Amino acid sequence: HPDLEIVVAPVIPSRPGFEAVYKIVYRNKGNQTLSQAYGINFFYNDNLMDLVSTSIVPTSLVSGGISWDYANLQPFESREILVAFNINAPTAANPVNINDVLTFTASILPQAGDENTSDNLYVYNEVVVGSYDPNDIKCLEGNVVSPAEIGDYLHYMIRFENTGTAEAENIVVRTEVNPADFDINSLQLLNTSHPVNAKITGNVVEFIFQNILLESGGHGNVLLKVKSKDTLQQGDNVNKRANIYFDYNYPVATNEAETIFQALSNPDFEQDQSISVYPNPTKDKVNVSGDFTLQTVQLYDVQGRLLQTQLANDNQSIIDISVHSNGVYFIKVTSDKGIKVGKIVKE
């Protein structure tokens, strides 16, 4: 039973004119050892940033896209790739300003035969900031999530920095899982910057870094995911924070990461009205085109379940829906400009 998963998380967030670093985490959740040429693909807008480095040498490098092979990925094994960019300054020909949104897309193959293809692709939208707290927590899905995703996983990145003047021998990251908001039994640790022991006591989770010996100014992080309670309703919000203990010092409290479940028609999502979807109705294939580079094309049923995802890196794409039954579907297209969601009928 092959079953792969991939996530993109910020190590150093995007700031205009500065270097940003992202972590691609991929994991084998199945029971087979897996290998795949060009198995990991990562897309970004190269008009808005310049690639600086990758921690693993790419197999392929094209404008706005990077590919890697992976080999002998063992069951339950997790690996990571770090990617660094220089983000454009506000004075650049293609400027990047505070509150702009940068989109990063990662996929892992094979999607064919995978037990759960919904986590073979991850789209991370990051709001550009002017500064950041080195000890913080962030929900990667954002501040606003569709009500259709109630009961699904939310991903959290907890970052910490030794701001003291001496080496930190032991660090503990402690976070409470509110049983009204989350299902603690679903919590999974996806990745950490250093070797860690995890401990759960009641609704409190501790990530214990023993003998980490983190130098002054050194950074670390924890990436986890947990399902929101399926009893939540539209308009409800979930909150998460953490306390970080450096040796015997008073804990450093992070911010509170708040996520609200409300319709995606809110102003946080810019629309790309140039996108066209045709023919409609259709019997098999759907053409998608627009004025801006397309990133992903996703097909949903009327219950809001994701049925199909296709990567794109051009201003046009074709998605084949012939395997699905006749009826009404929704197609969500994400481009460099924004998002467009439309209804399509298969005859």
Pin down the residues of each PLM region.
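Residue-level detector of functionally pivotal "anchor" positions at catalytic/ligand-binding pockets or at interdomain
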Residues: H1-P16, P134-D136, P147-A148, I260-Y278, ...
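Short beta-strand elements of extracellular/lumenal beta-sandwich folds
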Residues: A9-Q36, P147-E176
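Enriched for extracellular/lumenal, surface-exposed ectodomains of secreted and cell-surface proteins
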Residues: F85-A89, V101-T117, R241-Y248
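Low-complexity, intrinsically disordered segments enriched in Ser/Thr together with acidic residues
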Residues: D69-I98, I208-Q234
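Short beta-strand edge segments in extracellular beta-sheet folds
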Residues: V127, E258-Q262, K343-E347
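C-terminal outer-membrane/trafficking sorting elements
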Residues: E270-Y278, T282-E347
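Short, acidic/polar linear motifs in exposed loop/turn regions
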Residues: K29-Q32, A89, N162-A166, D230-L232, ...
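A surface/secretory-pathway sequence property marking extracellular, secreted
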Residues: S35-P75, E169-L213, Q262
